[in-house]
Amino acid sequence: MPISSALSQRGQFRAMYMGLKAQHRLDRTPVMLCEGDSWFSTPLSMNLLDWIVSPAPGDEERGVPQFGQGGLFFRVERSGDHAAPQGAAPGRAMFAKDNIDDLLGWFTRYDFDAVLLSAGGNDFVDTWLHGALAGSAHLDPAEAFEVIVSTGRYEQVRTAYEMFLRAFHTARPGVPILAHSYDYPRRIGSAAELGLGNLGVAALLKKSEGPWIGPNVEGVIDGGIDAWRAFVRRMIDGFVERVLEPLKRDSSLGGMFDYVDLRGQLTQDTQWNDEMHPTEAGFHQLAGIFRGRLIEKLPATKR
């Protein structure tokens, strides 16, 4: 069983944590709580979090940041989850009160060194995006982005983030919380191809997943793929400027919330598996950036 899969099981985490405690190794081993969406959980390939949990052979020799003493990861991420509560699927919201309360039970029971988040991308695509742009036509990217802004979606997502951050910061004020931006997609309209290599026999029932953006913009935004890329770029910049950055600057969080800006890293179509997910190599590149920032947040004895 892959390390990342094993550590996603709560019982496995508990057993491994207690084992490290019995061996007096917790003072050297960073312990992370991870909640997120498909950038932390997609089975299409090694994802962003997989590469942080299980670095590639040779990474250290190439100068990729490493945890000095390894790490223990409590993983509860799920592909498709939203940040803000959803009326149609309340159980798929990471920052809903029930989920926050559940995770707080673990967060206060074990000595975590950091919280890692991947949240917000799904809140702006798929059926929501279709509804937001319904009735619009012949828009340019700037006009389409203003439609998104007018829905109040950024405020909803920021409020959901804030609810999670305040709950966790109140519970343990000294624990850093690290999120990330998304990179700018290239292959707008491309579905995720599923196969035996990434999904096993489940792929026999479903050959692809998505696309989540292309079908919702192709009849609304004029200009083809270049215009669609420009629109999505504006949405991702808006996520940083209207959600992540204001929360980072919120003094009531004591400077304990931060995010890794991953924008502008993967600039080639070949670095993307589909319109929302990088390839395994793309995620590996982004993970090196994320891991370096995470190490900076850890206690000196655990870096």
Q: What are these model-predicted stretches?
A:
Residues M1-P30:
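Short N-terminal or domain-adjacent regulatory/targeting segments
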Residues V31-L33, W39-S150:
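Conserved SGNH/GDSL esterase-like catalytic core that processes O-acyl groups on lipids
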Residues H138-T159, F164, G223-V232:
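Surface-exposed cleft-lining segments at the edges of enzyme active sites
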Residues I188-M256:
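Substrate-gating cap/lid alpha-helix
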Residues E35-G36, H180:
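Short hydrophobic segments within beta-strands
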Residues R153-L205:
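Hydrophobic, aromatic-enriched interface-forming segments
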Residues G120, A179-P185, D261-G264:
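Short, well-ordered beta-to-alpha junction loops that form the rim of enzyme active sites
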